[in-house]
Amino acid sequence: MADECAAFMKGTELPVKRPREEEAETEMEAANNSNNGCEKEESSPYISSVLPGWFSEISPLWPGEAHSLKVEKILFQGKSDYQNVLVFQSSTYGKVLVLDGVIQLTERDECAYQEMITHLPLCSIPNPKKVLVIGGGDGGVLREVSRHSSVEQIDICEIDKMVVEVAKQFFPDVAVGYEDPRVNLHIGDGVAFLKNVPAGTYDAVIVDSSDPIGPAQELFEKPFFESIAKALRPGGVVSTQAESIWLHMHIIEEIVANCRQIFKGSVNYAWTTVPTYPSGMIGFMLCSTEGPAVDFKNPINPIDDESPAKSIEPLKFYNSEIHQASFCLPSFAKRVIETKGK
């Protein structure tokens, strides 16, 4: 899924979620030297030097603003082969997972992302059986896929083993999806994994990816979408994160144009609110391959009232009404998305 707060090590393969560009190494040094109110062994380069005791995310992807959360306690810090991993207890959003200085999820609002990126595609097709997750090492998407009793096989390819281990330790209610016996975990590069998938294998592919910068750029380009289309059966569906209409319409235009060239079934944009993501929202591309028609805007496959996994809590965010509403776009975004690539 590099950041603007510090020039940290970048992975060369598939990252998890939303890494940022390298920027301002001096901010890291200043933060290290500041008195942030935490114990010495709990200090972090991402604790703000301006607001001691607060975590601050400053990004070129949301210029002119910053997002800060008050830190009650730093629970974990580590460096994997690909990124820096931080977990802290916040005052208002519960535990927070941060990769390379970028918030990936919080206990309070993760449901809005995990539930929507998963159920928008899976509730739009009848009886999905084989599902592939690219990225998503925290296990949240797995948790949501496991609610669907028709699913027989859930494959996940995550590049960073540390993210999986940290999620299981500090976010058990998110990582609970790993307990499902249908799950097959592959540690490795998701792009390479997808290239080796036999044609027509999956009913659905869910891409829990990073932003289209740096090494993740290829996840939003034609070759990657072509690999997804090849891996899907006729009438199969893909769901992938697609940035913010408030900040990234130029990126969304390119994604929509690429998808319309590759996916001959349907191409749609939906969105949800996530307070700790840039601009407080994030979008998804929902596409289908040529074959049985898929009407993403009208769900046909309701989630079981009782999940096969009894340890999973009831849905917090998703329902059929919000499913339909998520495809309603502001006029400025609707004009661009409906005309791009046609």
Curated annotation (Swiss-Prot):
Span of domain PABS: 52-289
Record Pfam families: Spermine_synt_N, Spermine_synth
Catalyses which reaction(s): S-adenosyl 3-(methylsulfanyl)propylamine + putrescine = S-methyl-5'-thioadenosine + spermidine + H(+)
GO cellular component: cytosol
Name by which UniProt lists this protein: Spermidine synthase
Source organism of the structure: Solanum lycopersicum
Family stated for the protein in its record: Belongs to the spermidine/spermine synthase family.
GO molecular function (one): spermidine synthase activity
